[in-house]
Amino acid sequence: MMSITLENLAKLGASMIVDAEGMMSSSLESIAKKCAESGAKLYVKNAHKLMSIALERIAKAGKGNVTFDFSNDKKK
């Protein structure tokens, strides 16, 4: 699914679960911003695949509407 469609859904107030693997961090940031504007929630699976600066930008854009899932992080 194209991220522009996900952005439109978030703008309409649709909460969603997305997989960070294979998505650009800029797309996740845009979706998070739309979620913040509409009050929707964004749940990001495989968040350990993202760089820390990307996580910070997504979190800032989401203004408390983003949940990161690090549970699949097998690194020790």
Regions found by a protein language model. Give the residues of each.
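General marker for long, soluble alpha-helical cores
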Residues: 1-76
